[in-house]
Structures are given as structure tokens and as C-alpha cells.
């Protein structure tokens, strides 16, 4: 893990030296993506306190990735923002799965927020890729609500299951367009 992080930090340093602005930004984005993924994968495997710190690092790298993606031009910029929003949503989702009570609810809320942004961006893409990205976002939203419903009780649980079903039905409608 340490060697991978070191390698990707070197990749980031080299990317910052590139003269072509768009290429520079894209390569920095790629390095931030790899760093975020390293911390994310380690956070999933780690124990509670260590896991929390690793998730924070994963979020930090993905927020930087999102900032960089907003500077990229055209469809590539939108696609990179979608990718960053997805990973941010996953970071919060995985933390929510490990948490309990109000902390879990807040983390699920953060996950939903990022997956909604992912969906909003996916709607800006045309063609089958845009539809596929919307399907991915609807799946992630449905999964968030489903897992929240599993942790909730009574009426709150029923409402969350309803929202999960709604997103998965939308996912199915989109899939029929492919």
C-alpha cells in the first residue's frame, strides 16, 4: 500500500510538470484518482479508527479530483466529474455501512448527495454512455436507500424501501433504452 501511494504521489508530481494545460490537468486527475482508490481500498479493509482516517484521505483525493475535472473541457470533463462524484458517493456509502444511528444516516445522506450529482452530470452526456452513466447513478442511489432501509425501522424503513424501488425502477426504464 505504501509503495502504491508513493508511486502515485510521484505520478502527481510529474503530471504537474507537463506543459500542455489539459494534459497536465488530466494526468493530475488520474494520479488523484489512483491515490483516492488506494486509500478507499485500504479503508474498506481497515479497523474502525484507522478506516475513518483512510476514508478521509480517499475523500480528500476525490474532492481534488473533482476540482481538477471541472477544469477539463467537453465530455471528458463531465465524465471525470461523474467518476469523482461516484467515488465520493462510494466513500460515504462504505462509511455509512460501518456506522450506526445518526452517524450512519448523515453518511448515507452524503452518499446520496454525491450520487445525485453523478446523475445530474450523467444527464448532460448524450448517447448510450449518458444512459449507462444514469443507470449507474440510479443503481447507486437505489442501493443507498435500500441499505438505509435495512438499518431503519417502521415507517422510516418503508419510506426508504419505496425510494430504493423508485430508483431501481428508473434504472430498469433506462436500461430498456439501450
Language-model regions, residue ranges each:
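Tetratricopeptide repeat
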Residues: 4, 8-11, 58-65, 111-118, ...
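Short coil/turn linker motifs that delimit alpha-helical repeat modules in TPR/alpha-solenoid proteins
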Residues: 19-20, 24, 47, 54, ...
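Intrinsically disordered, low-complexity regulatory regions of eukaryotic regulatory proteins
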Residues: 25, 78, 98, 103, ...
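Short coil/turn connectors between adjacent alpha-helices in alpha-solenoid helical repeat scaffolds
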Residues: 1-5, 20, 40-58, 93-111, ...
Amino acid at each position: 500500500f505504501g509503495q502504491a501511494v508513493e508511486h502515485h504521489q510521484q505520478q502527481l508530481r510529474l503530471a504537474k510538470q507537463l506543459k500542455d494545460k489539459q494534459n497536465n490537468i488530466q494526468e493530475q486527475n488520474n494520479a488523484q484518482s489512483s491515490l483516492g482508490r488506494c486509500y478507499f481500498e485500504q479503508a474498506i479493509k481497515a479497523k474502525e479508527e484507522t478506516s475513518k482516517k483512510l476514508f478521509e484521505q480517499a475523500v480528500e483525493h476525490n474532492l481534488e479530483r473533482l476540482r481538477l475535472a471541472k477544469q477539463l473541457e467537453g465530455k471528458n470533463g463531465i465524465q471525470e466529474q461523474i467518476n469523482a462524484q461516484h467515488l465520493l458517493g462510494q466513500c460515504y456509502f462504505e462509511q455509512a455501512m460501518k456506522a450506526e444511528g445518526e452517524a450512519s444516516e448523515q453518511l448515507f445522506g452524503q452518499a446520496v448527495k454525491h450520487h445525485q450529482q453523478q446523475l445530474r452530470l450523467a444527464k448532460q452526456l448524450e448517447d448510450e454512455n449518458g444512459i449507462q452513466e444514469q443507470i449507474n447513478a440510479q443503481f447507486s442511489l437505489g442501493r443507498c436507500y435500500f441499505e438505509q432501509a435495512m438499518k431503519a425501522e417502521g415507517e422510516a424503513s418503508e419510506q426508504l424501501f419505496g425510494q430504493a424501488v423508485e430508483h431501481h425502477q428508473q434504472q430498469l426504464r433506462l436500461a430498456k433504452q439501450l
